């Protein structure tokens, strides 16, 4: 059964690209035509490419791999966080910090600092400080949570990235490429598809389109997580029975 249909994609405006003057010629194979000086994306290509991407994400989830969702612009920020949390995965939905992947050792130190501050904010340490010092630490905590809150429990580099807007998140994609981490991305007509392993040609600006992609991914991965949980319960029950 298909997670998403052509009709749903049309309704969500997935086929609307950018104005023709902003196009990237490398996206030509995925363009159906032009309407009112706007490129129209060929959904007959998008639909199977999206379903293929979903099947590959499904394989990663089955192996309990780490999926890092990246979407820092307004249209994607909220949805990226919600889907990652629902899928028990990880996210970056504010500014991408240069070196977030390629300088993981330093990022890990910042994550440790974030966790230390979280403990201090709850165990009464802040209340023992001067108002000025407590304010400084609260601001530091807020800043670190915004930047690293979505990856603080990742425990290592991700097994793949899922990106909304390849052009906007080009630094993240470059870092993943340098480390050999597979990249899944929504790629609009103004973007360069180079560096994206699993291209999904589509509108990356409209909230309805972005939400459709994310909802489909959430449905796919949530089913896998539920299956993994059921398998764990079955194994635990079996082991318990054997012990008895």
From Swiss-Prot:
Entries under PROSITE patterns matching the protein: RIBOSOMAL_S2_1 (PS00962), RIBOSOMAL_S2_2 (PS00963)
Coiled coil feature spans: none
A single MF term (Gene Ontology): structural constituent of ribosome
InterPro entries for this protein: Ribosomal_uS2, Ribosomal_uS2_bac/mit/plastid, Ribosomal_uS2_CS, Ribosomal_uS2_flav_dom_sf
GO cellular component: cytosolic small ribosomal subunit
Keywords, ordered alphabetically: Ribonucleoprotein, Ribosomal protein
One BP term from GO: translation
Cited Pfam families: Ribosomal_S2
Highest taxon above the source species: Bacteria
NCBIfam families per the UniProt record, alphabetical: rpsB_bact
Family named by the database record: Belongs to the universal ribosomal protein uS2 family.
Protein name: Small ribosomal subunit protein uS2
Protein's gene: rpsB
